[in-house]
């Protein structure tokens, strides 16, 4: 079970993604959640370790198939 903070990050990325395949910038996630970039980076790293995000080095955040299913479920509930 994910913490409420991790769920907020998943939902923010999901809402920001115009095209899921293009990914989302971590800066945009930080701005959406009104957190500092280092805080967002730590949480994104944690979500990568949980297998919900993939992140390019100095690049965009992408959902894994599992992460996308989870975010979609959160969004529709």
Where are the language model's segments positioned?
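N-terminal helix-turn-helix DNA-binding core of bacterial DNA-binding proteins
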Residues: 2-35
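Short alpha-helical segment immediately N-terminal to, or the first helix within
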Residues: 18-19, 52, 74
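Key DNA-contact positions within bacterial/archaeal DNA-binding proteins
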Residues: 38
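Short, hydrophobic-biased segments on the C-terminal half of alpha helices
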Residues: 44-45
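A short, conserved structural fragment
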Residues: 48-58
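Basic, amphipathic "hinge/linker" alpha-helix immediately C-terminal to the N-terminal HTH DNA-binding motif
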Residues: 59-75
